[in-house]
């Protein structure tokens, strides 16, 4: 890595040069850097806003799942069968599904070799269990912190190799002409002097491992400190794909954590209260006829954690809806593990068979919810205690939260975007569709970063592309001028951020009304047009929020436009999104009219929505999914090609 200075328009920046810049220090980013080094590419630089932040290191659940090819037991499995499982999630490209299946075992076993303690039996089989949307038993876990342990082991591998890292650098512009990437402009959030404020990175390749656009939503289970940077990639000319497809689910507010699995299966008391904590009510019983019916649905919510519009009528997702509606009334909703629901006036024998049999086999038909939780999953209790929440003493506030973006930046089967040299890996990339088995995101992050590294090492070595200087000069002048204009005695950027995130949660999350989306879309467009005039920061330390807000608004604009386009093309409710449709039906008469909807019939599952953000407008294209490839697998042919090219490209 070479370092010097670059000046333009009265602004100066440090300049670093390298072949490949890896943006992000989650599991996907670290794996990309580690794989590049293993493959012989040593001119690498890792760039991160905060090494200890991010979703991989700071998120999880009661039993965080990693999805892999079956490596135990008598049941048959194959790369092709796993690819078909992934492909069946709708709006999934088959070549990507095949890659995620083909490299699954390799990626998983690398993590094992690095020290991630995935459980195996005495004979060496890596045992598994069945997760949602999983026809086999491909899921495995090391407990609540699977992705954290992955990240820490990969980080140790990277540090052992001495791969350089620049911490406290926030990417604020991707240097691109819409066809080729030339580098990055970053804000040094630790700089004390204006002359040290900006850092330019000239590189031939960018591995973009920035995670999903978490900052768009106020109601979010993404860890505090993770914001994403999808908007910057869209601005640079990268296509978005499946932007409408998300996962939302119930999560605690402080700390941010999925309340899935045993958190629901132990049947906590669910109640709401006024803002000041008064007027407690077990509001679910206003809807359900009997405690047994309510508790059976609550139990299933543990198994079926993501909000699924197919499970609103007669299923467990009615719990998500009722929590959402209660919060819309201005009330706060809590899980209470101290006391049994309905004053204990229920019988385990009256629960639906799945709930009754599970709790009986677990020996958990006794005591209070926290006692049941301690019996069934003691680490789940310890997690909250470590965060300052004692479930034996404190209620847990929850909300319906954004959890994962199945869509994102469009990629090919090497995880390269339509902008040459820009690779998107991890949640930043759009490798998933409407539905996916639990844990596939962790597998996809490892596979995608491996594929990107393989392509870069084989095809994109050498010096950076020509064209950097004009792109860098323009970006430095524009972003430098923005900093000077926004620094004012009174700052409003934090308030604008909070307002925008709240509006997105109100109209662009799990419950989507076309009219409300159109109204907020126009507001976002106006905010972007007046951004330089209306956004202010009271001190240099707030500039990070200025650039963050800019990225967030671009993301919101693109995602809202995608939702509106989906509806205009006749799209119906599917996955984790309920689209209000007056032509539909309400599953329950007592629900508000906003819950009148039509279920998608799956006929659009073979088409993908792609979007190009150009000159402040979104251009949409719908195309057929790419099928699962059926390549020649005759050994001698593959072997010959492998000897000649490594079968890369």
Predicted feature descriptions by range:
Residues 239-382, 455:
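An anion/pyrophosphate-binding glycine-rich loop and adjacent beta-alpha core
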Residues 18-46:
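N-terminal Rossmann-like FAD-binding beta1-loop-alpha1 element of flavoenzymes
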Residues 15-18, 194-205, 418:
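Core beta-strand elements of the Rossmann-like FAD/NAD(P) dinucleotide-binding domain
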């Amino acid at each position: 890595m070479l370092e010097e200075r670059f000046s333009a328009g009265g602004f100066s920046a440090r300049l670093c040069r390298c072949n490949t810049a890896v943006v992000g220090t989650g599991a996907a980013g670290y794996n990309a850097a580690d794989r590049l080094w293993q493959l012989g590419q040593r001119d690498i630089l890792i760039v991160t806003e905060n090494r200890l932040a991010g979703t991989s290191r700071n998120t999880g659940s009661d039993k965080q799942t990693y999805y892999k090819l079956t490596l135990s037991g008598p049941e048959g499995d194959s790369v092709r069968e796993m690819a078909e499982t992934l492909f069946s999630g709708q709006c999934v490209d088959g070549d990507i599904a095949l890659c995620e299946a083909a490299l699954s075992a390799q990626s998983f076993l690398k993590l094992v070799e690095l020290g991630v303690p995935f459980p195996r039996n005495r004979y060496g089989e890596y045992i598994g269990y069945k997760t949602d949307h999983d026809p086999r038993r491909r899921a495995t876990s090391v407990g609540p912190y699977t992705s954290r342990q992955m990240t820490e082991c990969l980080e140790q591998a990277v540090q052992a190799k001495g791969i350089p890292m620049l911490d406290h650098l926030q990417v604020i512009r991707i240097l691109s002409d819409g066809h080729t990437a030339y580098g990055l402009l970053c804000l040094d959030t630790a700089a004390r002097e204006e002359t040290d404020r900006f850092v330019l990175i000239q590189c031939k390749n960018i591995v973009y491992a920035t995670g999903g656009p978490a900052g768009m939503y106020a109601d979010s289970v993404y860890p505090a400190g993770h914001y994403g940077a999808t908007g910057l990639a869209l601005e640079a000319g990268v296509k978005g794909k499946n932007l409408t497809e998300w996962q939302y689910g119930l999560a605690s507010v402080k700390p941010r954590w999925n309340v899935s699995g045993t958190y629901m299966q132990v049947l906590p008391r669910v109640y709401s209260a006024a803002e000041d904590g008064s007027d407690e009510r077990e509001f679910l019983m206003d809807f359900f006829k009997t405690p047994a019916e309510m508790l059976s649905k609550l139990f299933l919510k543990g198994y079926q954690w993501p909000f699924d519009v197919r499970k609103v009528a007669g299923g467990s997702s009615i719990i998500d809806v009722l929590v959402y509606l209660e919060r819309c009334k201005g009330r706060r909703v809590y899980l209470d593990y101290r006391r049994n629901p309905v004053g204990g006036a229920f019988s385990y024998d009256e629960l639906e068979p799945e709930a009754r049999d599970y709790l009986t086999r677990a020996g958990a038909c006794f005591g209070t919810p926290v006692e049941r939780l301690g019996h069934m999953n003691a680490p789940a209790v310890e997690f909250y205690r470590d965060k300052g929440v004692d479930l034996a003493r404190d209620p847990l506030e929850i909300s319906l939260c954004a959890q994962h973006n199945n869509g994102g930046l469009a990629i090919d089967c090497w995880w390269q975007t339509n902008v040459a040299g820009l690779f998107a890996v991890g949640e930043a990339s759009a490798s998933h569709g409407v539905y996916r088995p639990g844990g596939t995101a962790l597998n996809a992050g490892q596979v995608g970063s491996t594929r990107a590294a393989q392509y870069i090492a084989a095809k994109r070595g050498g010096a950076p592309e020509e064209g950097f200087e004009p792109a860098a000069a323009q970006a430095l002048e524009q972003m430098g001028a923005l900093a000077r204009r926004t620094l004012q005695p009174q700052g409003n950027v934090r308030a604008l951020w909070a307002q925008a995130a709240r509006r997105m949660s109100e109209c662009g999350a799990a419950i989507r009304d076309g009219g409300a989306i159109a109204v907020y879309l126009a507001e976002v467009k106006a905010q972007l047009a007046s951004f330089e005039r209306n956004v202010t920061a009271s001190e240099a330390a707030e500039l990070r929020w200025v650039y963050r807000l800019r990225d967030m608004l671009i993301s919101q604009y693109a995602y809202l436009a995608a939702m509106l386009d989906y509806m205009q093309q006749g799209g119906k409710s599917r996955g984790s999104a309920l689209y209000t449709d007056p032509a539909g039906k309400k599953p329950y008469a007592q629900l508000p009219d906003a819950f009148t909807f039509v279920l998608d019939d799956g006929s659009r599952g073979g088409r993908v929505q792609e979007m190009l953000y150009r000159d402040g407008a979104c251009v949409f294209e719908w195309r057929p999914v790419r099928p699962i490839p059926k390549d020649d697998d005759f050994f001698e042919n593959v072997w010959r090609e492998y000897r000649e090219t490594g079968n890369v490209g």
